[in-house]
UniProtKB/Swiss-Prot annotation:
Gene from which this protein is expressed: Ugdh
Record-listed NAD(+) binding positions: 11-16, 36, 41, 89-93, 130-132, 165, 276-279, 346
Name this polypeptide is given: UDP-glucose 6-dehydrogenase
Task of the protein: Catalyzes the formation of UDP-alpha-D-glucuronate, a constituent of complex glycosaminoglycans. Required for the biosynthesis of chondroitin sulfate and heparan sulfate. Required for embryonic development via its role in the biosynthesis of glycosaminoglycans. Required for proper brain and neuronal development.
Organism: Rattus norvegicus (Rat)
GO CC list: nucleus
Record's keyword terms, sorted: Acetylation, Allosteric enzyme, Carbohydrate metabolism, NAD, Oxidoreductase, Phosphoprotein
Region (Important for formation of active hexamer structure): 321-325
GO BP term, example: UDP-glucuronate biosynthetic process
Annotated metabolic or biological route of this protein: Nucleotide-sugar biosynthesis; UDP-alpha-D-glucuronate biosynthesis; UDP-alpha-D-glucuronate from UDP-alpha-D-glucose: step 1/1
Alphabetized SMART domains for the sequence: UDPG_MGDP_dh_C
GO MF, one example: UDP-glucose 6-dehydrogenase activity
């Protein structure tokens, strides 16, 4: 059997960095090198301040870095020396050309494949870690075959990640399963077993599932689509609850106790975000359309449509509650990451809510404990989000939640950071304009509603009628928009 002694991972992002750090920790005899073209990112991985926030990640990196874990921009040497190469680069949704707004853009995958074959000799295992469309491995293999050399033997595997940001280290150390797909040839199965041997250092054999390459690729898309579907399903029920007096949390508890359904991913909110769910569902929609399965495509498109609707509905409630105008009103946005315990803002609902409120002329004061100021400005300056001068005129980044809420008409919770449960809301209420509104888009204040109402707040939340002074309103006049739409103006530097 092939023995893997050196691993190279191309891509030092949210997948490559944590995944290879855990492999290095669990396999001290394997030398792991993570490479990236972004020199600033590599410098951050080699510094005390890592480029991404993830609970437990810093301890893992510091225990291995400089021993058997290395971060470098020397991509070619790392490829040449490796027995196994992970491809862990971004696969964004296309914003132009055929399949724009849905299909995955594989230009970085293709660039990696060409660089690998250029710098390889002898036997090497190349493994997809990025989320890719079905048959992407076949595209990689075609590039390898078209550029082959004497004695070159490159085996292509699919090994999708199933980690969740915020619990990535826990998920990597104790995964539900490890999925490895490869060719059903003797050479392909030899490569599969070599990668299995790496994971068997800490993962029980019964949790390592092997399939053909296509099944592995589709399993990743399907898993994310099913999780996104559950969130959209419970969010659809939340709209019904607000109109009837039911509580979506009670409904979710009741249906979640059914063992056939289970209680995971039944938390109603302002909508799902992150770098995977929307991208992968849209990729699945495009795949179905390309295979002439329009009914299946429409089914999965509805998952995205419901997520968009939930965001627009929440923004409409904010505007409606504030006497149908937020023009020149200060609104505090608490939380900008797409979920707690991460600094990742990709497809964050905060971006969408901020866009809708900026379009109405609101002045936003934004606070997030882990998202840098520069990242917030970049996200809100996206050509599809704001006009040229909107961010400079309407957005202020606050150093703490109290500063953000000082003099505000309303505070809007967009990320479920635990610290938001512990704030001094009496202090906040005293400094806000009256009536003071709280819009809880993550239901983090559920146990505090009576106390907050006693203080004087008017509460609006997802899937529950709290304030008795108004009837929940579900308008549809806020127009749709998507970060995947092609920009109608040049992005700012």
């Amino acid at each position: 059997m092939v023995e893997i002694k050196k691993i190279c991972c191309i891509g030092a992002g949210y997948v490559g960095g944590p995944t290879c750090s855990v492999i290095a920790r669990m396999c001290p005899e394997i030398r792991v090198t993570v490479v990236d073209v972004n020199e600033a990112r590599i410098n951050a991985w080699n510094s005390p301040t890592l480029p991404i926030y993830e609970p437990g990640l810093k301890e893992v990196v510091e225990s291995c870095r400089g021993k058997n874990l290395f971060f470098s921009t020397n991509i070619d040497d790392a490829i040449r020396e490796a027995d196994l190469v992970f491809i862990s680069v971004n696969t964004p949704t296309k914003t132009y050309g055929m399949g724009k707004g849905r299909a995955a853009d594989l230009k970085y995958i293709e660039a990696c494949a060409r660089r690998i074959v250029q710098n390889s000799n002898g036997y090497k295992i190349v493994t997809e870690k990025s989320t890719v469309p079905v048959r992407a491995a076949e595209s990689i293999r075609r590039i390898f075959d078209a550029n082959t050399k004497p004695n070159l033997n490159l085996q292509v595997l699919s090994n999708p990640e199933f980690l969740a940001e915020g619990t990535a280290i826990k998920d990597l150390k104790n995964p539900d399963r490890v999925l490895i797909g490869g060719d059903e040839t003797p050479e392909g199965q030899r490569a599969v077993q070599a990668l299995c041997a790496v994971y068997e250092h800490w993962v029980p054999k019964e949790k390592i599932l092997t399939t053909n390459t296509w099944s592995s690729e589709l399993s990743k898309l399907a898993a994310n689509a099913f999780l996104a579907q559950r969130i959209s399903s419970i969010n659809s029920i939340s709209a019904l609850c607000e109109s009837t007096g039911a509580d979506v949390e009670e409904v979710a508890t009741a249906i979640g106790m059914d063992q056939r359904i289970g209680n995971k991913f039944l938390k109603a909110s302002v909508g799902f975000g992150g770098g995977c769910f929307q991208k992968d569902v849209l990729n699945l929609v495009y795949l179905c359309e390309a295979l002439n399965l329009p009914e299946v495509a429409r089914y999965w498109q509805q998952v995205i449509d419901m997520n968009d609707y939930q965001r627009r509905r929440f923004a409409s409630r904010i505007i409606d509650s504030l006497f149908n105008t937020v023009t020149d009103k200060k609104i505090a946005i608490l939380g900008f990451a797409f979920k707690k315990d991460t600094g990742d803002t990709r497809e964050s609902s905060s971006i969408y809510i901020s866009k809708y409120l900026m379009d109405e002329g609101a002045h936003l004061h934004i606070y997030d404990p882990k998202v840098p100021r520069e990242q917030i400005v970049v996200d809100l300056s996206h050509p599809g989000v704001s006009a040229d001068d909107q961010v400079s005129r309407l957005v202020t980044i606050s150093k703490d939640p109290y500063e953000a809420c000082d003099g505000a008409h309303a505070l809007v919770i967009c990320t479920e950071w635990d610290m938001f449960k512990e704030l001094d809301y009496e202090r906040i209420h005293k400094r806000m304009l009256k009536p003071a509104f709280i819009f809880d888009g993550r239901r983090v204040l559920d146990g505090l509603h009576n106390e907050l109402q006693t203080i004087g707040f008017q509460i609006e939340t997802i899937g529950k009628k709290v304030s008795s002074k108004r009837i929940p309103y579900t308008p549809g006049e806020i127009p749709k928009f998507s970060l995947q739409d092609p920009p109608n103006k040049k992005p700012k530097v």
